Amino acid sequence: MAKGKDVRITVILECTSCVRNGVNKVSTGISRYITQKNRHNTPNRLELRKFCPYCYKHTIHGEIKK
């Protein structure tokens, strides 16, 4: 039996360098990824290194609120 319900939630990861630069003149948007995380294993905000097609490099993508 499961201990609790809604343990695994859907989160949105957003590129931190696009947001910090205020969407610089070269980039045309902000990269976002949708993934899931287990709330019991990772209670704090999730940060993953993913590819940003607007920055043309791998950057840190942080979890944002919905």
Swiss-Prot record:
Cell compartments where the protein resides: Plastid, Chloroplast
Transmembrane segments: none
InterPro entries named among the record's database cross-references: Ribosomal_bL33 (IPR001705), Ribosomal_bL33_CS (IPR018264), Ribosomal_bL33_sf (IPR038584), Ribosomal_zn-bd (IPR011332)
Record's keyword terms, sorted: Chloroplast, Plastid, Ribonucleoprotein, Ribosomal protein
Signal peptide (UniProt feature, chain positions): none
GO cellular component: chloroplast; ribonucleoprotein complex; ribosome
The keyword Repeat is annotated on this UniProt entry: no
Subcellular location, principal: plastid
Cysteines paired by S-S bonds: none
Origin superkingdom: Eukaryota
GO molecular function terms listed in the Swiss-Prot or TrEMBL record: structural constituent of ribosome
The keyword Protein transport is annotated on this UniProt entry: no
Similarity annotation: Belongs to the bacterial ribosomal protein bL33 family.
NCBIfam families assigned: PRK00504.1 (NF001764), PRK00595.1 (NF001860), rpmG_bact (TIGR01023)
The protein's name in its UniProt record: Large ribosomal subunit protein bL33c
Species this protein is from: Panax ginseng (Korean ginseng)
